[in-house]
């Protein structure tokens, strides 16, 4: 990333965002130093796959729906929905409920609370799904207790 920034500056086309996979489930950007580097260099982050390909929605709470990407083997493999992951999804869903949000809304809000995240890329397949996802912007404030609960759920 650092070298790409140098090249683009030389070309007078500065990079201003870094697009990375980022979600409650996938926080590699926090551990590999890229997020810190972006902050130090004034670069925003665009999060893609913010709902972990649908895992961070209510879609898989009761198993694998027949019409889902997972059932069709497209993008998301059945192996991704382990008993441990399903349990985490269910507990996260409970936290979302206490916030008056769906799991998807809370998962998006969790990203949008971060001033470094300039945008999230969502893959809504209907207008209704898009409208539901946009509700995440109505409550992006998290208490320290909520953030700690989420952290503990993910670290189990």
Where is each model-derived feature located?
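Beta/alpha (TIM)-barrel catalytic core signal, keyed to glycine-rich beta->alpha loops juxtaposed to Asp/Glu
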Residues: 1-155
């Amino acid at each position: 990333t650092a070298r790409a920034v140098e090249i683009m500056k030389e070309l007078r086309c500065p990079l201003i965002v870094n697009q990375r996979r980022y979600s409650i489930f996938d926080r590699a950007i926090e551990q590999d130093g890229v997020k810190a580097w972006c902050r130090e260099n004034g670069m925003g982050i665009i999060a893609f796959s913010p709902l972990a390909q649908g895992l961070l929605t209510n879609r898989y709470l009761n198993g694998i729906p027949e019409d889902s990407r997972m059932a069709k083997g497209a993008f998301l493999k059945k192996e991704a929905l382990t008993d441990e992951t399903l349990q985490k999804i269910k507990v996260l869903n409970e936290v979302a409920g206490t916030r008056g949000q769906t799991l998807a809304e809370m998962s998006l809000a969790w990203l949008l609370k971060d001033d470094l995240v300039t945008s999230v890329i969502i893959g809504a397949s209907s207008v209704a799904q898009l409208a539901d996802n946009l509700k995440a912007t109505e409550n992006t404030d998290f208490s320290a207790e909520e953030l700690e609960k989420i952290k503990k759920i993910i670290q189990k």
